[in-house]
A protein has these predicted regions:
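Charged, solvent-exposed interaction patches on well-folded alpha/beta domains
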Residues: 1-152
Length: 152
């Protein structure tokens, strides 16, 4: 049909702001870049994403979190893909969680158990390092302690 024009419109819902080489981009959950933005003029409260290859892996991370510790997604402020192999999570209370390269869901289940047993969000814990399977190293404002978590 010579006088017919077909237009396909795909709407991408902004899920996060991705930082790369000094620029900021709106991305959707599957990591597709929607548009470059000026962060000073943007007011939505979206997740910050950093690290090489992080947009492509974001959806799997969010899926793992949603399965193992669903409430955690509500407190995520920033995620960073470290050295192309593992994630750091920063929560809205500035708590840093270091995930391992493998068995992320199990580590997130352990984190959930720690949150349920301790008042982590209200404590002076500033970092939880889960990079060693079955263990959580806690860093507090006035020193460092270790807390063992049995596998679930």
């Amino acid at each position: 049909m010579p006088s017919t024009l077909k237009i396909n419109v795909t709407e991408n819902d902004p899920y996060a702001i991705y930082f790369q080489e000094g620029k900021s981009f709106l991305i959707d959950l599957d990591g597709s870049i929607i548009t470059e933005i000026n962060l000073n003029n943007y007011e939505d409260d979206l997740l910050f994403v950093r690290g090489e290859n992080s947009p492509e892996l974001l959806e799997q991370l969010i899926r793992d979190i949603s399965i193992a510790f669903p409430n955690l997604t509500q407190t995520l402020e920033e995620v960073e893909f470290i050295e192309k192999r593992r994630w750091n999570l920063k929560l809205n209370n500035k708590l840093l969680v270091k995930l391992p390269d493998e068995k992320i869901q199990q580590s997130l289940k352990n984190l959930k158990q720690l949150f349920e047993e301790q008042e982590v969000m209200e404590s002076n814990i500033i970092e939880i390092d889960l990079r060693i399977q079955g263990r959580a190293a806690l860093k507090v404002l006035d020193g460092k302690i270790n807390y063992g978590i049995d596998e679930i």
